[in-house]
């Protein structure tokens, strides 16, 4: 929220120094307060073991579907931080104002997480994730309103960003649980690492793609890319839910047979 203010008043280089300070604080807190989870410290991690885990994960259809949803939705947020400043600037917002307006996305994400935590046991993880995907699709469509001259204000776009953050909050935590629960216990750690890497990779690719096709100067181009990927995200979430139900049915049949 304060990156725009810092950059506008103290220079953009100061933002990197600020990130370094906060990164050092987070690292120190994790080092001091996060307990070690490895019980057998003599066990060594080898490249071969990691490769075998990844080969197993790429064969798990449910994991791939939910990992796809997580990667796409996380990439949306990362890429928006790259092209949204240009649209807010065209709407007359200063860098400081952009930071404050765009912070509504994070506030929406926090609220989405709270709603998810409260209702996931009632609606189910798959259903709530699918609802969040549809919500994000609608919010991306509403971003088009910022292109209509009569209502093209920073508030219009920031409201759509808030809705997008809310949908993101409904999705990411749930699909993370769904992805990790769809693999065997021994592959959970590798699955978590692979999932994080996929999110970063998709974010970098999507951000570069949008700038490459001119989405930073033509806002509608960026929205078209987000809209198409949002539909793919919905399909992945739906298919992942179907595969999870099939696997649960098979496990139930095996248990009943025994």
Per-region residue spans from a language model:
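Extracytoplasmic gate region of multi-pass secondary transporters
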Residues: 62-103, 108-110
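Interfacial helix-cap and linker-helix signal at transmembrane-aqueous boundaries
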Residues: 1-10, 88-89, 119-120, 210-218
